[in-house]
Amino acid sequence: MKNLFVLLVITILLSACSPETSEENATPIGDWRHHGGNHNSDKYAPLDQIEGGNFSELEVAWRYRSPDLDLPKDLAYPTGDYRAVPLVVNGIMYVNSNHGLISALDSATGKELWVFDPKSYELGPPLFFPLQTRGIEYWTDGEIERIFIATSGKQLVSVDIHTGLPDPNFGNNGYVDLKQNFGRLEFEMNNITHGAPPIAVGSTVIVGSKIYDFSMINRSPPGHVRAYDAYTGDFKWRFNTIPQAGEFGNETWENDSWRVTGNTNVWTYMSADEEAGIVYLPTSTPTNDYWGGFRLGENLFAESIVALDIETGERIWHFQTVHHGVWDYDVASAPNLVDIEVDGKAIKAIAQVSKTAFTYVFDRITGEPVWPIEERPVAQSDIPGERLHPTQPFPTKPAPFDRQGISEDDLIDFTPEIAETAREMAKEYVLGPIFTPPIVRGSNGKRSTFVVPGAGGGANFPGATVDPETGIIYIPSATLPHGMGLVAPPAGTSDWPYTIQMDTQIGPFGLPLLKPPYRRITAIDLNTGEHVWQIPFGKGPADHPMLEHLDLPPLGSVFSDVVAEGGVLITKTLLISYLAQRDEIDPEAHGSILVAHDKMTGELLGEVLVDQRLHGPPMSYQVGDKQYIAVAGGGRDDDNELLVFALPN
């Protein structure tokens, strides 16, 4: 009876929704069907009811308390920042919790229609604490409609969007065991889990993985990517991100290191060109992120963009952004697909932003760079057993969107006292251009290599946003430098000769060591490769006691407690993001500030104070004649909730 009622409610809501469709991605205008809005991952909502003149009037229309908070305490695990991306399909919202529960909601009121619980907590503790699940995937063939989720319990689940029940025709009553069909088995299976959503195109569901980065023992699993039949759950193919014997790229792992190396996984979001039948994989660094002496060679397909045939898993093209990485420069976000015109030539393009602060732009069908990418010599390591690649790829266009490398000229110098202290502190570190290698702590009297951007800096997992109408890409970034020093682990604790020790929050008098800006948003026209505008994002430490008399402009937020937050959303006229009140107003403040800029100029147009700390990527949708903005927030204090904003009636 309850299911009949749910179906009736859904039917009524469907009748109220506009059938109008956006030409760019075949998604009905007003819907948000995938984590990035569509499989292009453009994060663009072609809506304009909320605009610069009324943005500051936004108020919370409704809130949805995470069902995680109702789980029995003896079953639930501590959860992290709530970063889920809600989906809206024909007026119904679907959103996951950190424990992987899926809720269907009336997207106009927040009324709960159903909740599905995969009960992954019954399968043992999660690999990563606190627990976090970042999204779900919607799939339809035009008749059947499903939600897919990859859980922390190593399950792929198919849920009927109308009933909230597992699909009995998929796998074992709706569940596929992701511990199977992985290939190499001589590793620690407990070191792998899932957090980002799968991607489903055609009749195929593709699943990445989340693997622990700092294992002290070399038994991490390889990050092979697997695909399943969307109807039956049958295993379809596996792409070995670490090529096995006889496969292309296997020779880039010297001394048979491919047999024992792990990671090189796809832990973040993926994108796909549905018409071309291509899925794009952003891959991570191989095991031991910071020392590669046992895995000499280029190490394909680590830190790469890999284009695969969706139906077969065959490699079409790839590009490695970092050869033999030792900086933890994962390709950390979904690439953006956009059609551009360069020198009169139409190009179906793909743009990949990175932790390195480079933007790599290619023809997404052929893999040809839109502008030349040059292999340039880089500094080499003097660590015994290590051999770095002699060159690294440098795009000639666009210019970097954040600081790269460090010299004395980059040190903070607002006052003579600050400048002198910064210079003295910098003497403890190796300074140099991007790709300066880590050192063994204490070498030549230095603590570590000062790496800029750091592993959490540049563009991280929120990635970029691209306007399909103009070809302008918007990139939120942070400098976030840190010191990388290698140390010998205590006897008997590791089979690595070196593990990493990080030096963080380095700087004089509680200030950053570098000059601002510390966080920024950059707009780049992908038709020309030129920067359109760049702004510091956030006030930063302008009110520091040693700076407050200088009346400084915004310096960019210093990210007081996180490496990356939710990224940016664009609409017809706006660029929307948020800042933490503790960075902008008061160190003791709890909430956030929802912020809107003019997307063509970067001009600040409006702000809204929010009484919750926001963490998830913002998205926007429309039901009937009303536009909404939704963001997930809370999480560490048993306050996980979804906040939905709208203009007053």
Segments predicted by a language model, with ranges:
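C-terminal motif of bacterial Sec signal peptides marking the signal peptidase cleavage site
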Residues: 13-16
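Bacterial signal peptide processing site
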Residues: 18-20
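Repeat-blade elements of multi-bladed beta-propeller folds
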Residues: 32-36, 78-101, 128-155, 190-217, ...
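N-terminal cofactor/phosphate-binding cores enriched in small/glycine residues
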Residues: 39-142, 147-179
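Extracytoplasmic beta-rich repeat domains
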Residues: 64-85, 115-141, 172-197, 212, ...
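Structural motif
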Residues: 155, 162, 216-224, 291, ...
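Beta-propeller blade signature
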Residues: 159, 163-164, 221-234, 295-314, ...
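Phosphate/diphosphate-binding loops
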Residues: 334-383, 634, 644-647
